Amino acid sequence: MGKTSSKNKINNLLVDLESTLNYKIEKDGTIKTKIFELANSNDESTSTKYVKVSIFDKEKRGTILHDKKTISRLLETPSKCTKQESKSIGSMLGMVIGDAMGHRFEFQNLVYDTITLKNMGKGKGGEFQLEPGQWTDDTSMGLCLADSLLVNKGEFDPRDLMLRFLLWWNCGYNNAFRFDKEIKSSCGLGGNISKSFRAYVNEKGKNPYTKAGDNKTSGNGSVMRNAAVPICFHNDIKKGREIAKKQSLVTHQGDEAAACCELLTFIIIKLINGSELKEVLDKLGEEFKCDVESVNTLAKSEQENDDIDRNWNWKDKNFKYSENRAKRNPGYIGSYCMDCMAMALHVCYVTDAFDKAIIKVVNLRGDSDSVGSVVGQIAGAYYGLENIPKDWIKVVEKWDNQEIALRGYMLFHLFDDIKSRVNDL
């Protein structure tokens, strides 16, 4: 996607989709809509390349400004949140914290029982040399999903979502560098998602659900970004599962990937509504059912068959990743959605605090940012905002202007009064 020809195709695609998505493409390449407003840059060579604003910018946003003030108060004094608000905000923040901390060890070889990172870190680090609190594709795509649901008032629009993904990768929308003095490109694009982008562009946006790969294409790229769905649909578990599956199919044809998104949504909706984590996980096998038998087996925490690489017994206190997959790709272990979900459930099952869960999972290395993101979503939805270390949240706030938490708050309240909550987006 980095080649000029690909970028030209994307520019042409944006023009083709103009009427569908109400976008106006200016001659200089900027995108003018009530959703995106490109900030002017002193450097004219980059002013049209990077989207440096969010859907919450600009002054006259009515209740949006009220919500920004509200979220500041809630972050300062979490006890003012309702339990459900706290869990919803906690899940969104958990996604970014797990991602940001996990990036420090991403692509490093898997290790067990070695704890060397106990906080957000200091100085630049990780594959992409990010500052503490800066995030990768996991969170950026999760924010694209959140924005799409907010702007479309809870209706799922796969074309809108894919366009936001393209804007992230090609224009920097929702990346971690909006308040960074350095001009940086978006980072972390996975192989399966990259193929889905290319397919979408080559087809000129005819099919919003990817034709790249096949029904076995089940990386963790759709699971890692799923946080917004259970928050938005916390009162409708059937609808939440449906949207989780659909958002997965935008970039992954894989049956297991879609079913893992359903499973994650099921768990988090239960937690937001007050269920105990241990109870949810202990009853998961009997209460969760889907069309993919391997994911049903994972929910039961069982061995799938005689193949040692299909062991999903995450309740075992000594549970480990597939030994063969870990040997083949020790720096990428966890990138398969089943490995990702199994390890995330294991970590949440054997720990008793948000910080303990995050510290345990990111220190495993491998695909630590994505598995960390999933752990953060679950742990945040259970322990809530008040139990996330404040200093960790402060590190993230340097780069997000409290808008990740704001999205969690607004998604939770989206169906309370759509007109007042999402007016003028």
Segments predicted by a language model, with ranges:
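Structured, active/binding-site neighborhoods that engage oxygen-rich ligands
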Residues: 2-425
